[in-house]
């Protein structure tokens, strides 16, 4: 589970900003909201970020996704850019390094992974583990500008042979993380496997607002041989007042014509998948059919006739099932997209009531109705705000000193928590 993530000099974030899943002293719904990662240490399962348009909410999620990419991606060569973008709205920051750090738990051990980099190089990278109260260095990497080379100091407690250390060092070019180089190296199993696998398998990419999730739903249903997922989806949709009796996945094979082959060749598809398609000489088209009950009869509707909201919420149901059955970290941008507020609240409530593992969600939203709900803990709420210089600042609701009897919703509406968007006159002179 992620305990804390800090960012400095990344897109609209200039000074150090931090998101934390460590709970406050509040005991309200502690069992539902938190999970004990080790004796005496609990972490929150949910974080919710509010903010005006262009205040930097999405940049926080993108920073976590970029952090994951640093851990896993092996550059093509030493000249490939890292992809990092610093704060560009002053002359100093755009020439300074970006810093990122994450505190997370794997199997009751606390890890701290930190990077310092610019567009061309990773200047430092450190991985520390706390198996007890004392920190243990697993490795520390540094860049020497004079020789244009990277040096890695591996910790004794990593218990890795010198030969394996040399293999990883040889694969760690200046724009590549040690963990990414490790992922491409044939070396013995160590704690690096646990860290690499955590990011590869448990930290998911950002779910963007434009994703209707149709393809994701189809792929999950196609693998649902026992029918457990389908049963969960139908129960969830019925409880959410959708008049849907069944969802059926239909498959139809289509021969690849010369015209279709040309489209496949130019499509942004994985090379191996593309080659397999062309080898078979046919492709499989899938479509969802929804069975709606109207009175005493049931009618079939194909997915093209379903609303964006229905398709989005169907996808959210599949994601919810995924979160409850596996241990994952899922960031969702503008979670309320195409979804009625009551459905959003229900989605969060079901997750909290049924989550018994280490799954976490970090959500961004514009829907301030959640601030008026009794079931929302204040330490799960964060606000982003941009100052007059274009810099994003992040603040936690529980740190603002709002009295427990005062409504966060009313305080937000009155501009007492963060600045609200300043709106001019609704009358416009069309002749100007």
Indicate where each model-derived feature is located.
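Conserved P-loop NTP-binding catalytic core
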Residues: 34-48, 52, 61-113, 118-122
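Conserved Walker B
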Residues: 10, 334-339, 368
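C-terminal lobe/lid and adjacent interdomain/linker elements of RecA-like ASCE P-loop ATPase modules
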Residues: 1-4, 326, 346-432
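Conserved catalytic network of the ASCE P-loop NTPase/AAA+ motor domain
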Residues: 41-42, 93-95, 105-107, 321-324, ...
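Pre-Walker A-like glycine/lysine-rich segment at the N-terminus of P-loop NTPase domains
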Residues: 2-66, 432
